[in-house]
A protein has these predicted regions:
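Class I S-adenosyl-L-methionine-dependent methyltransferase catalytic core
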Residues: 1-196
């Protein structure tokens, strides 16, 4: 009798195209090419994130730093963000973000900025300030160990430029100590293997 191999659900989720889990675009899949540089946020972590954010997404400008698949920014659009800015340095992945925007019919509400977002503290691009920002910082987790100065400089530069009423969400793995973030009333929510 042949043995049936069981697929770990988390591995299957990581290998399949991310889907939007709430809002007006719920159930729609994103353009995706499995790549070791891209780690889409797990559905349950994204659901918890948007439970925390709540209505702050409505009318906000979502800024998805380290966008990868764009799952976070497109989720924000689906849940009422007025527009989304995706920051992605890998050009083929940036092209997939543009394809996702077209297939979802939201290309008029999306801007893709290609380049290294960690250079923004030195050369901050022009960003709209006519609505509060909803900033997502979900980098490769090792950046908090290998590039902590760059990560904190990015966070400081964005916080300084942000309009009043903006919200910041940082995702790291559970080994990250949220006390390393600049003091300002951060809430830490462990959702293993991540912490928001």
């Amino acid at each position: 009798m042949p043995k049936h191999s069981r697929t770990d659900p988390s591995q299957a989720e990581a290998a399949s195209a991310p889907r939007i889990i709430g809002g007006s675009l719920r159930g729609r899949r994103l353009e995706f090419s499995p790549d070791p540089r891209t780690r889409p946020m797990k559905d349950r972590v994204r659901e918890s994130l948007f439970d925390l954010v709540g209505t702050r997404a409505t009318g906000a400008i979502a800024i998805d730093c380290f966008a990868g698949s764009g799952a976070i920014g497109f989720e924000a659009l689906s849940r009422g963000a007025s527009r989304a800015i995706f920051c992605e340095r890998h050009f083929p992945t940036a092209d997939l973000l543009r394809k996702s925007a077209r297939s979802l019919g939201v290309e008029d509400r999306v801007e893709v900025k290609t380049g290294d977002v960690l250079l923004w503290p030195k050369r901050m691009p022009a960003l709209p300030t006519d609505a509060p920002w909803l900033v997502f910082i979900s980098p490769p987790w090792e950046f908090f160990q290998s590039r902590p100065g760059d990560m904190m400089a990015l966070l400081a530069a964005l916080r300084q430029a942000a309009p009043p009423g903006s919200t910041f969400v940082v995702e790291a793995d559970t080994s990250f100590d949220p006390a390393a973030l600049p003091p300002d009333g951060w809430e830490a929510r462990p959702i293993p293997p991540a912490v928001l």
